[in-house]
Amino acid sequence: MKATIILLLLAQVSWAGPFQQRGLFDFMLEDEASGIGPEVPDDRDFEPSLGPVCPFRCQCHLRVVQCSDLGLDKVPKDLPPDTTLLDLQNNKITEIKDGDFKNLKNLHALILVNNKISKVSPGAFTPLVKLERLYLSKNQLKELPEKMPKTLQELRAHENEITKVRKVTFNGLNQMIVIELGTNPLKSSGIENGAFQGMKKLSYIRIADTNITSIPQGLPPSLTELHLDGNKISRVDAASLKGLNNLAKLGLSFNSISAVDNGSLANTPHLRELHLDNNKLTRVPGGLAEHKYIQVVYLHNNNISVVGSSDFCPPGHNTKKASYSGVSLFSNPVQYWEIQPSTFRCVYVRSAIQLGNYK
């Protein structure tokens, strides 16, 4: 049984929608394929000892300390110094204080999901010089913690009370790859321009189900996935996507978008998936026919009444354009018999096209 648990811990992560924490090792089953895998600790990092004492009521095994679901109101004392994963989720902790994690210089993952944390002392995470994953979701934070470890690769803080994202918060976090800030009362004015810009390895941002009305400015060119679903964005202009040359997936479903300005998609030359379903679009966004790599376009549940024969595919048979594997246009006013058959001439599998079912 123990061997099975450790194998789960060391499994490669995968992504499948918003992060849902349900147990100790579910933190490895993460959104949308970040590609981050936990490092196997090198036994040479630790000196032989008789073994530290496990905190009361917690479970300790192979440098994993599980103290979840115990009703704790503070971080346990005397945590084993060789701990690499500390699970404190589903407790009643209200504050993270300086010294709570002292001597945990080998900690790689810290799970604080579903507590009542409203305050984190500025130096609380300073001793964690090897921390790569920090999970703070489902708490009561109004701002992100200060002075997070420079080794951090993944930060998840959805379902808090965060209203501000400051640029200084991410200063020096050059190893960051994944940031999840969904389901917070964030407004566009609360995100400083260029707040994410300095993180040169950042590839995934999710700010879904908030109150932002525009795409954040100054996003890093390293981004490959941007998920802004369930917000109050009304328009996509060319400037908002400028410089996102590596973006492969853009999620803008369930907003109030009525227009995508001409030239916007040209700023994302490697885009493969575009999710614009459940918005207020009246026409197919311009630039799809010229886009070389795009393969999936979701436009269902909009107000599109006309689809032109050149909206999706270039003239003739342009072999340089990737074939679509998914185009959804159902639940729009346009009738399927009003669409010319040649409209989807660059779609080689007809089952990839979804039409009809408009009420």
Curated annotation (Swiss-Prot):
Biological processes per GO annotation: animal organ morphogenesis; negative regulation of angiogenesis; negative regulation of endothelial cell migration; negative regulation of vascular endothelial growth factor signaling pathway; positive regulation of autophagy; positive regulation of macroautophagy; positive regulation of mitochondrial depolarization; positive regulation of mitochondrial fission
Keywords linked to the UniProt accession: Corneal dystrophy, Disulfide bond, Extracellular matrix, Glycoprotein, Leucine-rich repeat, Proteoglycan, Repeat, Secreted, Signal
Propeptide, residue positions: 17-30
Glycosylation sites: 34, 211, 262, 303
UniProt key word Repeat: yes
GO MF assignments: extracellular matrix binding; extracellular matrix structural constituent conferring compression resistance; glycosaminoglycan binding; RNA binding
Tissue: Detected in placenta (at protein level). Detected in cerebrospinal fluid, fibroblasts and urine (at protein level).
GO annotations of cellular component type: collagen-containing extracellular matrix; extracellular region; extracellular space; Golgi lumen; lysosomal lumen
Top-level taxon of origin: Eukaryota
Subcellular location(s) per record: Secreted, Extracellular space, Extracellular matrix; Secreted
Cystine residue pairs: 54-60, 58-67, 313-346
LRR repeat residue numbers: 73-93, 94-117, 118-141, 142-162, 163-186, 187-212, 213-233, 234-257, 258-281, 282-304, 305-334, 335-359
Reported modifications of this chain: The attached glycosaminoglycan chain can be either chondroitin sulfate or dermatan sulfate depending upon the tissue of origin.
InterPro entries found in the cross-reference section: Leu-rich_rpt, Leu-rich_rpt_typical-subtyp, LRR_dom_sf, LRRNT, SLRP, SLRP_I_decor/aspor/byglycan
Signal peptide: 1-16
Presence of the UniProt keyword Methyltransferase in the record: no
Disease in which the protein is involved: Corneal dystrophy, congenital stromal: A corneal dystrophy characterized by congenital corneal opacification consisting of a large number of flakes and spots throughout all layers of the stroma. It results in progressive, painless visual loss. Corneal erosions and photophobia are absent.
Quaternary data: Binds to type I and type II collagen, fibronectin and TGF-beta. Forms a ternary complex with MFAP2 and ELN. Interacts with DPT.
Function: May affect the rate of fibrils formation.
Family: Belongs to the small leucine-rich proteoglycan (SLRP) family. SLRP class I subfamily.
Protein name: Decorin
Organism, as annotated: Homo sapiens (Human)
Gene: DCN
